A protein has these predicted regions:
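Serine-esterase "nucleophile elbow" of acetyl-processing enzymes
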Residues: 2-68, 80-87
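Short gly/ser/thr-rich secondary-structure transition/capping motifs
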Residues: 7-11, 73-77, 111
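Conserved donor sugar-nucleotide recognition element shared by glycan-biosynthetic enzymes
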Residues: 42, 72, 154-157
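Residue-level signal for threonine
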Residues: 44, 71, 198
Length: 227
């Protein structure tokens, strides 16, 4: 038998015998994934999402690869390889804010996002969820003079995220509309640094993602939200 064919058949058979309560969740992205602004690791949005997954999959594992300051090129170079090796069932991607701040070319961002999603789809069996960039224009840490400019550019980045997720047939979570709705009325959703979400903000973020996960994997009657 051809070695490549044998390996392919072996992996399929191995997957059939995977215990039903095992589940691997990999979170990729920037400081929002790492949880900057939260009061601790258990209050990050990946940890809150994982807590809901754990209700259904007792032996589930979370691997949080998020790093502060990461642009999409950093996610590809520093996180993608690890994510593939972990053989995830679910991958969430939160990236783009640092590309906006560091003026990554829109064409480059588009190409990198397409590459990131397509490699994950090709080399893993994971369901992929990508969130767009929350509205940054109302954040206290953003100088007023830059708010209009950032809002215009943000819409362009989010348009790319929408187009690429649709093209690649992965799930888009719309955090932009949600953050725009709450930014002015609920300042407690923003942490003391004036930039990142607070515990409450991350809980709201997590619930938006959990809603999507329920439709993909979980028993809707048993899974509880985190906020």
């Amino acid at each position: 038998m051809n070695i490549k064919l044998f390996k392919k058949v072996f992996l399929k058979i191995k997957k059939l015998f995977k215990p039903a309560d095992k589940f691997t969740y990999v979170a990729m992205g920037d400081s929002t994934v790492e949880g900057i602004g939260s009061s601790g690791p258990k209050k990050t949005f990946p940890a809150l999402v994982f807590a809901s997954i754990k209700q259904e999959f007792k032996h589930a594992k979370l691997h949080n690869l998020g790093r502060g300051g990461a642009k999409i090129s950093d996610v590809i170079s520093s996180q993608l390889g690890s994510a593939i090796q972990l053989k995830p069932d679910l991958v969430t991607i939160s990236v783009g804010a640092n590309d906006l701040r560091n003026r990554t070319k829109l064409k480059q961002f588009r190409n990198d996002l397409s590459q990131l999603i397509e490699v994950l789809k090709r080399k893993t069996d994971a369901k992929v969820i990508v969130n767009n960039i929350p509205d940054l224009s109302h954040l206290p840490s953003i100088p007023f003079v830059f708010r209009i400019y950032s809002k215009i550019l943000l819409k362009r980045f989010n348009q790319i995220i929408q187009e690429q997720t649709h093209k690649s047939q992965v799930i888009l979570v719309d955090l932009y509309s949600q953050s725009k709705l709450f930014a002015n009325k609920y300042p407690e959703f923003i942490s003391s640094d004036g930039l990142h979400p607070s515990d409450t903000g991350y809980a709201l973020w997590a619930n938006t993602i959990i809603t999507q996960i329920k439709h993909l994997f979980l028993n809707k009657q048993q899974i509880k939200t985190q906020f």
